[in-house]
């Protein structure tokens, strides 16, 4: 009975090759749409956005998780490029920095037209698939990029923003971030302020995906209950597998299922294993858990490549996606489930967001109250009349009367 023992390693190798071959076969027909990649930030950090610097050539770019050969090897067919500006730009130059990073994405697509197709719709993604190009979309990572302005939000939409992450790792005046749940930030909005609710409604009206990565649990729940369309978590994993507050807890996963929304799993080691080291199999554990709790329709990929310092063994860069798909097939995921995670789930959610939009509806116009705006370097134009300025004028009046009150008290 042991006469064939020497064949076992060969059988294992052949089985591994089978799953890898199957992964490539599936991905040729259904390439992956990744929800979050920070290559634009690397282009700023390494080259100050000088894309014509010979070192910035994306066909030979070194030292990053992402370049054109790696995208091709990984069967990446769609990418939300992250337009990110750090939290320390809030109330300073966040809007300018955001515009510059959007410009980088546009220029990158124009410089490599044989590889990238800039798109703003689900139909555009499908067109890129047909042309064998990487559908390139813009996701703005952090609500501080709109500077608490509905007008800025609409302008960013016109420039191509197709998802907005409501916060990064800092509160905005209208939404709370995930550090509230760790105790490292104080809650300001109890999820969403009234102005934050208007932001959600305006994103729905425009047909912009709402991204709940980085937000507090209260903000997750408030948005899932308010939004008229499904939402995404562009780069978040499962809290029950790794208890990082950047991940999505099971009660929220159940809301994701109820709203037909989407969790695109982040590959950062500390959100996968809760340690500095992780591996591909542990990423698959997160995908399994989300599928179990929220359903196969709720699963996607948001690797956070080039935005994190540590990625799992076996997922060293964007070229490794076929190995992750092979692992899911090894775990008895069906071809339909795999295709859903690769692209179909994101396309379904995006199409639902587009269908829920209503550009003929009047836009949200009520600005944020002046006393809720942060930062000292602001003018008050437009607040000189109406309720918002009334509180300010009363405050100035009371301040001017303070010396008189003090004098009277001394009489």
From Swiss-Prot:
Pfam family, any one: Peptidase_M19
Ligand binding (Zn(2+) 1): 36, 38, 141
Tissue: Expressed in lung and kidneys.
Transmembrane segments: none
Record comment: activity regulation: Inhibited by L-penicillamine. Beta-lactamase activity is inhibited by cilastatin.
EC number(s) per entry: 3.4.13.19, 3.5.2.6
Outcome recorded upon mutating residue 304 to L: Loss of ability to hydrolyze cystinyl-bis-glycine
Organism domain of life: Eukaryota
Membrane topology: Lipid-anchor; GPI-anchor
Signal peptide: 1-16
Listed cofactors: Zn(2+)
Cysteines paired by S-S bonds: 87-170, 242-274
Subcellular location: Apical cell membrane; Cell projection, Microvillus membrane
Sample GO molecular function, one term: metallodipeptidase activity
InterPro entries linked: Dipep_AS (IPR000180), Metal_Hydrolase (IPR032466), Pept_M19 (IPR008257)
Protein residues bound to substrate: 168, 246, 304
Residues annotated for Zn(2+) 2 binding in this entry: 141, 214, 235
Lipid-linked residues (GPI-anchor amidated serine): 385
Residue ranges the record assigns to the propeptide: 386-411
Catalysed reaction equations from the record: an L-aminoacyl-L-amino acid + H2O = 2 an L-alpha-amino acid; leukotriene D4 + H2O = leukotriene E4 + glycine; a beta-lactam + H2O = a substituted beta-amino acid; L-cystine-bis-glycine + 2 H2O = L-cystine + 2 glycine
GO cellular component, one term: extracellular space
UniProt cross-references to PANTHER family, sorted A to Z: DIPEPTIDASE 1, MICROSOMAL DIPEPTIDASE
Family: Belongs to the metallo-dependent hydrolases superfamily. Peptidase M19 family.
Protein name: Dipeptidase 1
Organism: Homo sapiens (Human)
Lineage of producing organism: Eukaryota, Metazoa, Chordata, Craniata, Vertebrata
């Amino acid at each position: 009975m042991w006469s064939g023992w020497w064949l076992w390693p060969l059988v294992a190798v052949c089985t591994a090759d089978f799953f890898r071959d199957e992964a490539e076969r599936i991905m040729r027909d259904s390439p992956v749409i990744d929800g979050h990649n920070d290559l634009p930030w690397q282009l700023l950090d390494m080259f100050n956005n000088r894309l014509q610097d010979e070192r910035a050539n994306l066909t030979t770019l070194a030292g990053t998780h992402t370049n054109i050969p790696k995208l091709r090897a990984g069967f990446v067919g769609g990418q939300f490029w992250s337009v990110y500006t750090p939290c320390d730009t809030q109330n300073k130059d966040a809007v300018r920095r955001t515009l510059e990073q959007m410009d980088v994405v546009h220029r990158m697509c124009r410089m490599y037209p044989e590889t990238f197709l800039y798109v703003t719709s689900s139909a555009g993604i499908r067109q890129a698939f047909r042309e064998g190009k990487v559908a390139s979309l813009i996701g703005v990572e952090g609500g501080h990029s709109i500077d608490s302005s509905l007008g800025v939000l609409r302008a960013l939409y016109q420039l191509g923003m197709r998802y907005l992450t409501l916060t990064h790792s800092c509160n905005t005046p209208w939404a709370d971030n995930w550090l509230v749940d760790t105790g490292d930030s104080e809650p300001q909005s109890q999820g969403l302020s009234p102005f934050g609710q208007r932001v959600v409604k305006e994103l729905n009206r425009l047909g912009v995906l709402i991204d709940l990565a980085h937000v507090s649990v209260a903000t997750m729940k408030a948005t899932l209950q308010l939004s008229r369309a499904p939402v995404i978590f562009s780069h978040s994993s499962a809290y029950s597998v790794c208890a990082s507050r950047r991940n999505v807890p099971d009660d929220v996963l159940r809301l994701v299922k109820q709203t037909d929304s989407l969790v695109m799993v982040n590959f950062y080691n500390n959100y996968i294993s809760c340690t500095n080291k992780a591996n591909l199999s542990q990423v698959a554990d997160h995908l399994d858990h989300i599928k179990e709790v929220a359903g196969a329709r709720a699963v996607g990929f948001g690797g956070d490549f080039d935005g994190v310092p540590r990625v799992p063994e076996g997922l060293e860069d964007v070229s490794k996606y076929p190995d992750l798909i092979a692992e899911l097939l090894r775990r008895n995921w069906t071809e339909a489930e795999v295709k859903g995670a690769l692209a179909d789930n994101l396309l379904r959610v995006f199409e639902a967001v587009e269908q829920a939009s209503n550009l003929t509806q009047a836009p949200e116009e009520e600005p944020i109250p002046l006393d809720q705006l942060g930062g000292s370097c602001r003018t008050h134009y437009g607040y000189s009349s109406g309720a918002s300025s009334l509180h300010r004028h009363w405050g100035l009046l009371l301040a001017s009367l303070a010396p008189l009150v003090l004098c009277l008290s001394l009489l």
